[in-house]
Amino acid sequence: MPADIGPQIRPARESDAPVVLDFIRKLAEYGDISAEATVTEADVRAALFGPRPVAEALLAYVGDEPAGFAVFSFTFSSFMGKPGIYVEDLFVEHRFRGHGVGKALLITLAQRGRERGCGRLEWSVLNWNEQAMEFYQDIGAVPMEEWTTFRLTGEALERLASGATIRIGLSTRAKT
């Protein structure tokens, strides 16, 4: 990447859905979780540009070339009494890493958060991705080691939604 050309960041448009989808697939491949990336272009269009969008995306370009992206949504912190931004995905093409693309995406996200009165910017990182963790700490982010992320998907989510749980002591476990 030429040193005199910095990344340009802009919101994704509906016509960018194929580019966003391509980045999602590349991120899944990088994380060795391609099988989990079942998203389609129609899913991207509905989530980002449908009648009730649930997320937004930013694209980073170097010249005319897509260099990276971020997908994010707004959250709410009851403790702070303020909204926040959760960054679902952040990915930079390998050849553009180390050239300010990721930082430019995060700066843009922080600016959007400031404009909307957000009190925080949060994201998760795979625990083996030391390069990313070092980058995040270099910009001032702090790992939240006292928190553990839980997730319900598929059959477990369906069971809970249908009310099929039993109470055991102080914890709730799904029926088997």
Please provide the spans of the model-predicted regions.
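A short helix-loop-beta-strand connector motif used in the catalytic cores of GNAT acetyltransferases and
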Residues: 46-59, 86
